């Protein structure tokens, strides 16, 4: 009984296999020719690359060809041809019977010879014979890297940020960072050590915006201006002035004022130093972002930094008064805001935490790697997904950000990860509404190496005036 059923089952499977084979043969016989409009990729090495020439009909003697299938068997050389472009020359030693396409096919349209299209950050150019040649630059948005990060157990998720699409990794490093690493003299400046009181315990989580509501400002967007030195400095100073004035002054300070006017050893949208930025804020001061708005997100090393449009004079006791009207003609208030000298904190996480909790957000230098641009959410740490790739895929540069808090999170695998919360200067569309979390206590990306604090210059007359 079971033998009969087994025989019937095998017979049925054999019949289905034969039917599928016939359908495959019919599909090939009924398919339109590949070269009705001429041979695309006429210089392509298909049969030759595989050293493949088959007699008669051999459906397995096939290769992928521009989204279709081409063959290297004699059967392909019939009225309706589905031969690979080099079949006639390589297998038969004769010229092909079809002319090469004068142009290249992409996305359903034909491009003329020397026509171009962009594939992410790489330009592809059509050459004679119908084949494309594309640049091989590493792109800032790397879909393969996104997949590798999200498959791994790294504690954070990567994503495609449309504002970065079409940029090379080199352009991201050149235009989206912009803090020049301090000189050895500055890096060796004395640290101010913060001592925890006996029995003092810091909370497991803290966020500046919760302690000082309405006094912590949201991230701005530096665009393709390599000016993180100005944006992070203005961001920390804005919060510190707001906190130290007890909310009597709550300016969003102008990065453009620094970019255009702080020109001593600074390079505007081509990069700058933090010590120079804090010197300018202490000695000259800046106005609000409303008064002197950012000129545009497309400033870069190829465009000159706009000239300085704010000037001031000394009033005595180190204070400054503006002598220029606001570049934004719709704003009347041209008040100058200043700070005291910046000071460096120790690299111990508890010292940074205590300073942040008592006096407000701090500024941190960090090394940005190729995967950081793709950050979407979670607790960031630099991943090894680019190891083993050529050097041009493994780039890094110096950046500066504003640290606003800290916390801990238990991951699905049971690990507890400590983190900093920081504000970037790439706009609210990036990361966690413009912010990111990064592993705390291990000096991840050197973020605990060079941390600065500052006091807003606030007097009683300022409190009354504002």
UniProtKB/Swiss-Prot annotation:
GO terms for molecular function: cysteine-type peptidase activity; laminin binding. Disulfide bonds join 53-72, 70-72, 70-84, 76-83, 84-91. The keyword Cell cycle does not apply. Highly expressed in kidney, heart and adrenocortical cells of adrenal glands. Moderately expressed in spleen and liver. Also found in prostate, seminal vesicle, epididymis and testis in male reproductive organs. In adrenal glands is found in the outer cortical regions corresponding to the zona glomerulosa (zG) and the undifferentiated cell zone (zU) (at protein level). One of its GO terms (cellular component) is cytoplasm. Induction: Down-regulated in prostate after castration. The keyword Glycoprotein applies. Residues 49-96 form the SMB domain. It is found in: Secreted. Transmembrane segments: none annotated. Glycans are attached at residues 77, 160. Glycosylated. Residues 1-21 form the signal peptide. Keywords: Disulfide bond, Glycoprotein, Secreted, Signal. GO terms for biological process: proteolysis. May be implicated in the adrenocortical zonation and in mechanisms for repressing the CYP11B1 gene expression in adrenocortical cells. This is a non catalytic peptidase C1 family protein. Belongs to the peptidase C1 family. This is Tubulointerstitial nephritis antigen-like. It comes from Mus musculus.
């Amino acid at each position: 009984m079971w033998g009969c059923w087994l025989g019937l089952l095998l017979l049925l499977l054999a019949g289905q296999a034969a039917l599928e084979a016939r359908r495959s043969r019919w599909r090939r016989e009924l398919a339109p020719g590949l070269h009705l409009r001429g041979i695309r990729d006429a210089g392509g090495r298909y049969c030759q690359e595989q050293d493949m020439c088959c007699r008669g009909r051999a459906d397995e003697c096939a290769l992928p060809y521009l989204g279709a299938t081409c063959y290297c068997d004699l059967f392909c050389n019939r009225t309706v041809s589905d031969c690979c472009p080099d079949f006639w020359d390589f297998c038969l030693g004769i010229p092909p019977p079809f002319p090469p396409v004068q142009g290249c096919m992409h996305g359903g349209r034909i491009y003329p010879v020397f026509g171009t299209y962009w594939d992410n950050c790489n330009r592809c150019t059509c050459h004679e014979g119908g084949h494309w040649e594309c640049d091989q630059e590493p792109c800032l948005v790397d879909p393969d890297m996104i997949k590798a990060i999200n498959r791994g157990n790294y504690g954070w998720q990567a994503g495609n940020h449309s504002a970065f699409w079409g940029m090379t990794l080199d352009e991201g490093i050149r235009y989206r960072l912009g803090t020049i690493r301090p000189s050895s003299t500055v890096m060796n400046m004395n640290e101010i050590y913060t001592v925890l009181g006996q029995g003092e315990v810091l909370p497991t989580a803290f966020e500046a915006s919760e302690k000082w509501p309405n006094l912590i400002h949201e991230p701005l967007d530096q665009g393709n201006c390599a000016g993180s030195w100005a944006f992070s400095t203005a961001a920390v100073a804005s919060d510190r002035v707001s906190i130290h004035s007890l909310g009597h002054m709550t300016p969003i300070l102008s990065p453009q004022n620094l970019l255009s006017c702080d020109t001593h050893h600074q390079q505007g949208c081509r990069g700058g130093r933090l010590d120079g930025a804090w010197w300018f804020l202490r000695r000259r001061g800046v106005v609000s972002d409303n008064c002197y708005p950012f000129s545009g997100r497309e400033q870069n090393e190829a465009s000159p930094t706009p000239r300085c449009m704010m000037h001031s004079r000394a009033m005595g006791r180190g204070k400054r008064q503006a002598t220029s009207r606001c570049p934004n003609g719709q704003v009347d208030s041209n008040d100058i805001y200043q700070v005291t000298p910046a000071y460096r904190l120790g690299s111990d996480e508890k010292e940074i935490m205590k300073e942040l909790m008592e006096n407000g957000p701090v500024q941190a230098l960090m090394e940005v790697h190729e995967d950081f641009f793709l950050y979407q959410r979670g607790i960031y740490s630099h991943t090894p997904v680019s190891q083993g790739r050529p050097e041009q895929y493994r780039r890094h540069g110096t950046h500066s950000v504003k640290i606003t808090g800290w916390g801990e999170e238990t991951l699905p695998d049971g690990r507890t990860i400590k983190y900093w919360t920081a504000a970037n200067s790439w706009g609210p569309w990036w990361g966690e509404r413009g912010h990111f979390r990064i592993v705390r206590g291990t000096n991840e990306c050197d973020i605990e190496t060079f941390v600065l604090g500052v006091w807003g210059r606030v007097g009683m007359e300022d409190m009354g005036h504002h």
